[in-house]
């Protein structure tokens, strides 16, 4: 039997981390949108980990592509190949143009895709 306090996303194998640095306001928008996406997916009780990246060394060690970086099961579903690592604000391509955070729909898709990969054993 699964304990009642276990988040639904954890049961589905989905873990979410928002990496950020204090100088970028977009991580708070991303945090709100992640919560909305989880709520729309019926996963509103899911814990979201926040990880402060506050030095260039930590940015390199974490493979931090800018704030906010949203990791779903440890993977950045929005990373562009060759995007620089470092302490900077990040831009995302959305259906409405460039923005400081993915849309709720984009986040829902990323979370659902990660859950599907987890349940089928895919990477």
Regions from the language model: what does each represent?
Residues 3-5, 24, 86-91:
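Functionally engaged cysteine thiol sites
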Residues 1-14, 28, 102-123:
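Iron-sulfur (Fe-S) cluster-binding modules
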Residues 75-114:
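Non-catalytic, surface beta->alpha helical segment in thiol-disulfide oxidoreductase systems
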Residues 7-39:
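Local sequence-structure signature of Cys/Sec-based thiol-disulfide redox active-site neighborhoods
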Residues 57-63:
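Acidic pyrophosphate-coordinating catalytic loop
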Residues 64-71, 87:
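Structural micro-motif
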Residues 44-56:
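Thiol-based oxidoreductase modules, predominantly thioredoxin-like and allied folds used
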């Amino acid at each position: 039997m699964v304990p009642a306090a276990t988040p639904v996303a954890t049961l589905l194998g989905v873990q979410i981390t928002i990496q950020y640095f204090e100088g970028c306001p977009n991580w708070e928008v991303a945090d709100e949108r992640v919560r909305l996406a989880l709520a729309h997916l019926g996963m509103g009780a899911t814990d979201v980990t926040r990880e402060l990246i506050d030095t260039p060394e930590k940015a390199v060690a974490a493979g931090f592509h800018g704030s906010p970086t949203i990791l779903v099961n440890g993977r950045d579903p929005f990373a562009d190949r060759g995007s620089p690592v470092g302490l900077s604000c990040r831009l995302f391509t959305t259906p409405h143009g460039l923005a400081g955070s993915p849309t709720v729909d984009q986040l829902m898709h990323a979370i659902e895709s990660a859950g599907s990969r987890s349940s089928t054993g895919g990477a």
